[in-house]
Amino acid sequence: MPNAQIPVLKKNRTKKRTSRKIAILLILLFIVLLAVLFFRSSLSRVSEIRFDGNVFSTRDQLLNRSGLAVGDQYFGVSSSDISEKLREIQSIQQVTVDKQFPGIIAIHIKEFATVAYELQSDGSLRAILANGTSVSVGSSGIAVEKPILTKWRSDDPYKAKLCDALSRIPGEWTADISEIIPAPIPSFPDRIKMYTRSQFEVITTVSLLNSKISYLNQVLETEDPGLITMLEADSYVPFKPDTSEEGQEKDTTQ
């Protein structure tokens, strides 16, 4: 009778379920075994660390700050942690970490732009970055089109503001500025004096520099060397010729 076959069907179903469980367990064990073998193999380790874009920080400095080393667990490396650690270096503005399987960590460094150089008491120059950080020039070389800051105190609050202002001005507009020195007065505590390679003398303030730079370049391009004042009002006065030199020239022509 049909009812006599029901126990047999239940036994078959039980066997099938047991077989499936065993198969699943075997698959899981196989996956675990593969994972153990993988994490013990060289494929799971950092095999190469690359840096690019760094000028003021050496490879050793970046490695020490990041804590990275060849042989570290590749999947244990946190891109956000590395970026955060490297951005603690004052010359670094942005960090991008690119993990390339298997084993390669490529780190792209963006440093703050150099806006000026500073003359030290021993005659050496240090690069001044857009955030006001002073760094050793080293083997990176000097960009001759950048101004030199002289007579600035290290704790002068207007120095960092000046660097920020310079970073916002196109490089071709500051290329003629050769030197910037502080020249504060009671009414203008952030007053500065600038000298240009084209023999102009410029008086302005840190806070006005960005808004006055277009006027400055207009005068530099169209006028003879002279004194340019860019404060509440703008003015230009050409330098008077040296009468003594003119007299000497006349004597030699007679």
Curated annotation (Swiss-Prot):
Localization per record: Cell membrane
Single GO BP term: FtsZ-dependent cytokinesis
Boundaries of every POTRA domain copy: 44-112
Mode of membrane association: Single-pass type II membrane protein
Keywords: Cell cycle, Cell division, Cell membrane, Membrane, Transmembrane, Transmembrane helix
GO (cellular component) term, any one: cell division site
Record field: transmembrane: 22-42
Cytoplasmic side: 1-21
Residues exposed to the Extracellular side: 43-254
Domain of life: Bacteria
Record's function text: Cell division protein that may be involved in stabilizing or promoting the assembly of the division complex.
Protein name: Cell division protein DivIB
Protein source organism: Paenibacillus polymyxa (strain E681)
